[in-house]
Each structure stands twice: as C-alpha cells, then as structure tokens.
C-alpha cells in the first residue's frame, strides 16, 4: 500500500469491539445440544481449553475438529450445563474480552459417580474479526473434584489471622 500504514478509526474499533462482543455473548449463551455448533465460532485453527488442571498444564483443544469432538464429550458428560451470572468485561484491545460467570449442571463423567457441578469461572477470549482465536477457562479445581466425588484434602492454615 505505497508504504502507508493502515490506521483504524475510533468507529472501526468500536464496530470490531461490538462484533467480537456479540460472539462472546453467543458463546456464553449456548446451552444443551446447541453447544455442538460452538466450534463454528472459532477461527479454523482456534483453540479452547482449561487452564486449571491437575497436571498444572493447560488442556487445550485446537482446530474445528478437535473443538467439535470436545463439544460432543461435553454434551454427554455435562448435558444440562449452563453459564449464568455472566458478566462480560471489555478491554482496551477490541479483540480481547474477559468474562466472569458461574456454571452449573449434572456431571456424568465416565469412571465417576453421577454428580452435580457448580463453580465460578473466569474466561479469556481473544478474537479476530468476530471469531475466537483462543478461549482460556479458569475455575476452582477443588469444586471439580467435589463434583466428581473425589475426596478433597484439607490444607492446614495454622497461624493465618482470622
């Protein structure tokens, strides 16, 4: 472009922010079998995952096929899952949003007794032109253990002021 640098106008930035926010709102509103189409909200090589795992390493699913298979597993294991108390926070970057919310639903994970999960979540969404590039999910892993019927160890907090 003749060495000229493209600069977005404030109006362009606001349009992009609204487009990206609508995608985040759609993602958070999906329930039940509708979640089976959630991968379509991502760029082709987009990724999503849980950043609070027992290994200490994120569990990441990359690309539409991997995200589709994850959605199928989630539909089987958490069939009535829903996000609620959703609060979406915009940042200075129109391509990055944070979400704070609660999640709840039956936990039917193979190898564990049927349970019910309620947890508090933080999501980071990085987007590109209305499509998700990366979604990182953070939650309290202790609540996940309880939902799966796994005994939770007690942490001694001697000396902590109350």
Swiss-Prot record:
Keywords: Antibiotic biosynthesis
InterPro entries: NTF2-like_dom_sf, PhzA_PhzB
Family (UniProt): Belongs to the PhzA/PhzB family.
Pathway annotation from the record: Antibiotic biosynthesis; phenazine biosynthesis
GO biological process: one example: phenazine biosynthetic process
Residues forming coiled coils: none
Lineage: Bacteria, Pseudomonadati, Pseudomonadota, Gammaproteobacteria, Pseudomonadales
Protein name: Phenazine biosynthesis protein PhzA1
Description of what induces expression: Under control of LasR. In liquid cultures (aerobic), phz1 operon is induced by quinolone signal via 2-heptyl-3-hydroxy-4-quinolone (PQS). In biofilm (microaerobic), phz1 operon is not induced by PQS, because the biosynthesis of PQS by the monooxygenase PqsH requires molecular oxygen.
Function: Involved in the biosynthesis of the antibiotic phenazine, a nitrogen-containing heterocyclic molecule. PhzA1 (operon phzA1B1C1E1F1G1) has a role in the biosynthesis of the phenazine during planktonic growth.
One Pfam family named in its UniProt record: PHZA_PHZB
Organism field: Pseudomonas aeruginosa (strain ATCC 15692 / DSM 22644 / CIP 104116 / JCM 14847 / LMG 12228 / 1C / PRS 101 / PAO1)
């Amino acid at each position: 472009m003749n060495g000229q640098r493209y600069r977005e106008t404030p109006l362009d930035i606001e349009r992009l922010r609204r487009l990206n926010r609508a995608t985040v709102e759609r993602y958070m509103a999906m329930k039940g079998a509708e979640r089976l189409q959630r991968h379509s909200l991502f760029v082709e090589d987009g990724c999503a995952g849980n950043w609070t795992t027992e290994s200490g390493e994120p569990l990441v699913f990359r690309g539409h096929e991997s995200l589709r298979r994850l959605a199928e597993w989630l539909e089987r294991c958490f069939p009535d899952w829903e996000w609620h108390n959703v609060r979406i926070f915009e940042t200075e970057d129109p391509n990055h949003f944070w979400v704070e919310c609660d999640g709840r639903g039956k936990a039917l994970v193979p190898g564990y007794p049927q349970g019910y999960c309620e947890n508090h979540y933080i999501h980071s969404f990085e987007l590109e032109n209305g499509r998700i590039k990366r979604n990182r999910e953070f939650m309290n892993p202790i609540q996940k253990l309880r939902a799966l019927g796994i005994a939770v160890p007690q942490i001694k907090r001697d000396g902590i002021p109350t």
